[in-house]
């Protein structure tokens, strides 16, 4: 899907304009020595960087990217570069830094290997009925008929459609937009491991196709949280006995479930959204 590939390119590097702030051998060596966790992971990425040089795909001067090691037009990690990088321009090398065809063909290869089905959509915007109390989340997959039975409807009217199981995504809680997401959304999610990222890719894909943007209204009465504030929220939830995983600021199903339980205890609307209201409530306890 050329629109999805273009969306990844735009989000990752502003079409090749950004993402070249750190020299990878130095950045990854620092992470190997200084990172509190994942030292083995970064050691592997450093070794992969050296293998790319040894293979002759790039010169040392090309190795500029993000602080965590991602680089090239579509910001591959070095190990992903070795595993999925392809030659798109026929010169015998996989050069994701200087060759746009190589970068875009490699991104297509990544999405395909992650399960992206050409011609199938990622999902679409939906509305949930007032008082909805059913399941939600990317991994809570059910047939379309299940969601129809729970009163979920397409924005703008019309019945639900799509083959295979889908998850109901409520990124801003029950008071914001909703999305029914399918297998292609999971492929976009695998690129970065974040619903915010996968939604950005998916919505931009639709916009590039000329489709309308999000119709639902995002909440404005409860400020969102910075990454550090999301980490603080997760630490506070963990201290109260909730299993939210590593307090890394990435909000997944466990964090949203814990937020909803805390909201119920505090007599707040159960939205599952990591906002300032629930953070301040936990700070005050």
Identify the residue ranges that each predicted region occupies.
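Catalytic glycan-binding domains that act on GlcNAc-containing polysaccharides
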Residues: 1-164, 176-179, 187-205, 210-227, ...
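Short secondary-structure transition/capping segments
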Residues: 16, 102, 257-260, 283-285
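Acidic/histidine-rich, surface-exposed loop or edge segments in extracytoplasmic proteins
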Residues: 182
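Short acidic, glycine/serine/threonine-rich helix-capping segments at coil-helix boundaries
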Residues: 225-230, 238-282
């Amino acid at each position: 899907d050329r629109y999805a590939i273009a969306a990844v390119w735009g989000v990752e590097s502003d079409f090749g304009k950004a993402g070249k702030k750190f020299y990878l051998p130095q950045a990854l060596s620092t992470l190997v020595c200084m990172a509190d966790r994942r030292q083995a992971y970064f050691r592997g990425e450093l070794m992969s960087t050296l293998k790319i040089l040894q293979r002759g795909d790039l010169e040392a001067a090309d190795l500029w990217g993000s602080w965590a090691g991602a680089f090239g037009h579509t910001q591959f990690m070095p190990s992903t570069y070795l595993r999925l990088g392809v030659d798109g321009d026929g010169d015998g090398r996989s050069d994701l830094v200087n060759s746009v065809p190589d970068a875009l063909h490699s991104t297509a290869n990544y999405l395909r290997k992650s399960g992206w089905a050409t011609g199938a959509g990622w999902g679409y915007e939906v509305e949930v009925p007032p008082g909805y109390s059913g399941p939600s989340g990317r991994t809570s997959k059910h047939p379309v008929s299940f969601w129809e039975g729970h009163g979920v409807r397409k924005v703008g009217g019309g019945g639900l459609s799509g083959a295979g199981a889908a998850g109901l995504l409520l990124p801003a809680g029950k008071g914001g937009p909703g999305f029914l997401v399918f297998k292609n959304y999971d492929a976009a999610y695998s690129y970065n491991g974040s619903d915010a990222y996968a939604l950005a890719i998916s919505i931009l894909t639709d916009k590039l196709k000329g489709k309308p943007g999000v119709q639902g209204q995002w909440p404005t009465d409860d400020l969102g949280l910075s990454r550090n504030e999301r980490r603080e929220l997760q630490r506070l939830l963990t201290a109260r006995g909730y299993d939210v995983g590593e307090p890394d600021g990435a909000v997944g199903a466990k964090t949203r479930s814990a937020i909803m339980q805390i909201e119920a205890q505090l007599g707040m609307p159960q939205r599952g959204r990591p906002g300032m209201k629930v953070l301040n409530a936990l700070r005050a306890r």
